[in-house]
């Protein structure tokens, strides 16, 4: 509620917010629950701050009001505190970040004036945009020596993703599905941030199958993954159930005792893998993609990727 009054741009009616807060508090009381803000409040009200020589606070522009109260409490018994952040990177106001507290901090201020990441042309564009933001700390800093480039495209189809590592960023999660569809149309190897792509999982099973065919004994856990990608035409499920779960098995033993019926190439043997995935994996291998590694291309929301970096970044400007 306090943040509501401080945030003039709130899109929710105060009456609705009060109902939500009341119902949430009732739910927590009825079920004996506390949440993270409750933990902070309890420590601020009755906790004992430790005596510390120094404290370090990072990404301070993203702290909420209650988190700032926690910092102040800990500072009471600390000899020194170092607080780092950048108000120009404050993109979590929607999540309660109170940037004004960071901007108005008292104490000695040091600006890191040399970027190790940002090339010259992206630097110029970023500074042109950030100057439109009101209530910020003016700061002078320099880009690295590389010139870099800034290009404008009408759509993702115009972007050449064939080389290098990429981030493709959008404002909201609902936009990512459409981005993924376009990357699929372009037959590219990509992933959603923090998610392992399906084709990578399948490719790992393909590699295990190839090892098995070469005579390499595999542990039950790997055998189970291979069997899961075969229909009963290629592996008898009843005989598979008799396998001892802690053992290692070669292909001859699996055929003799445990129901394996084939030594075909992976695209025939792993007949539970869909035709679309088979086509995509073959296409990616032919194009030179290394499916043993994570994809060169990641898609994410702008908020979800904060702190990451790539040599190529595409920003979708749709809202």
Predicted regions and their residues:
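Conserved interdomain hinge at the start of the Helicase C-terminal
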Residues: 149-164
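Accessory N-terminal region flanking or inserted into the helicase ATPase core
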Residues: 1-56, 65-70, 93
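Conserved helicase motor core of SF1/SF2 NTP-dependent helicases
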Residues: 54, 61-147, 167-182, 191-200, ...
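Core RecA-like ATPase module of SF1/SF2 helicases and allied nucleic-acid translocases
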Residues: 120-123, 170-319
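Ser/Thr-centered flexible coil motifs
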Residues: 13-14, 64, 219, 274
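A short acidic-Thr-Gly-centered motif at the start of a beta-strand
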Residues: 45-48, 159-161, 289-293
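Short loop/turn elements that form and flank the Walker-type P-loop nucleotide-binding site
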Residues: 49-51, 77-78, 162-163
């Amino acid at each position: 509620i306090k943040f509501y009054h401080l945030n003039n741009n709130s899109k929710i009616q105060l009456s609705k917010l009060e109902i939500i807060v009341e119902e949430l508090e009732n739910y927590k009381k009825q079920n004996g629950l506390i949440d993270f803000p409750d933990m902070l409040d309890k420590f601020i009200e009755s906790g004992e701050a430790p005596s510390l020589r120094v404290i370090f606070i990072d990404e301070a522009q993203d702290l909420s009001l209650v988190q700032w109260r926690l910092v102040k409490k800990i500072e009471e018994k600390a000899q020194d505190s170092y607080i780092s952040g950048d108000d120009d990177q404050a993109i979590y106001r929607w999540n309660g970040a109170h940037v004004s507290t960071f901007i108005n901090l008292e104490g000695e201020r040091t600006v890191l004036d040399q970027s190790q990441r940002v090339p010259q042309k992206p630097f110029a564009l970023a500074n042109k945009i950030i100057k439109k933001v009101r209530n910020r700390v003016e700061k002078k800093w320099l880009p690295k020596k590389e010139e870099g480039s800034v290009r404008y495209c009408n759509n993702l189809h115009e972007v050449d993703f064939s080389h290098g590592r990429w981030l493709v960023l959008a404002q909201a999660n609902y936009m990512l599905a459409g981005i993924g569809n376009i990357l699929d149309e372009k037959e590219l190897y990509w992933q959603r941030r923090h998610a392992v792509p399906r084709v990578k999982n399948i490719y790992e099973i393909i590699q295990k199958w190839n090892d098995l065919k070469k005579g390499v004994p595999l542990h039950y856990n790997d055998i189970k993954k291979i069997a899961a990608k075969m229909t009963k035409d290629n592996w008898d499920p009843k005989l598979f159930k008799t396998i001892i779960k802690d053992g290692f098995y070669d292909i001859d033993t699996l055929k003799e005792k445990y129901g394996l019926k084939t030594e075909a190439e992976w695209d025939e043997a792993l007949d539970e893998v869909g035709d679309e995935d088979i086509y995509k994996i073959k296409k990616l291998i032919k194009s030179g993609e290394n499916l043993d590694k994570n994809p060169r291309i990641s898609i994410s929301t702008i908020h979800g990727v904060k702190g990451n970096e790539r040599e190529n970044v595409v920003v979708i400007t749709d809202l």
